[in-house]
């Protein structure tokens, strides 16, 4: 993990890249009572064409938003309900270029992160 200090604002941002290419950023703020997690992917409403194994595939409009909702489906119901029942406030959004998922909680943060 690489850490970068921002002395003018008294913060240190920690960064790591996982083997699968996912970038993780952690900003520890011990004075905060809430914890936040945010995941974003570079796939949004304008992304209706993608290349897989050298072949182009076209998708209908709205696929990114549809997938945003499908990501919360679980074998036993819905991850939004599970997070809320565990004290978190979850949500998601799809913009033109990205889809983001996030939650905040004051307790059980690590459990909700899993």
Describe every region a protein language model picked out.
Residues 1-79:
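His/Glu-rich zincin catalytic helix
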Residues 58-60, 69-114:
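Active-site-adjacent, His/Asp/Glu-enriched structural segments that form or flank metal-binding
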């Amino acid at each position: 993990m690489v850490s970068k200090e921002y002395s003018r604002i008294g913060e240190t941002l920690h960064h790591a890249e996982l083997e699968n290419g996912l970038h993780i950023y952690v900003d520890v703020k011990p004075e905060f009572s809430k914890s936040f997690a945010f995941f974003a992917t570079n796939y949004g409403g304008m992304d209706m064409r993608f290349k897989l194994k050298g072949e182009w595939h076209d998708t209908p409009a709205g696929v990114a938003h549809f997938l945003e909702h499908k990501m919360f489906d679980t074998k036993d119901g819905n991850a939004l309900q599970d997070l809320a029942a565990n004290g978190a406030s979850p949500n998601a959004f799809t913009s033109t270029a990205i889809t983001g998922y996030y939650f905040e909680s004051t307790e059980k943060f690590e459990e909700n992160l899993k």
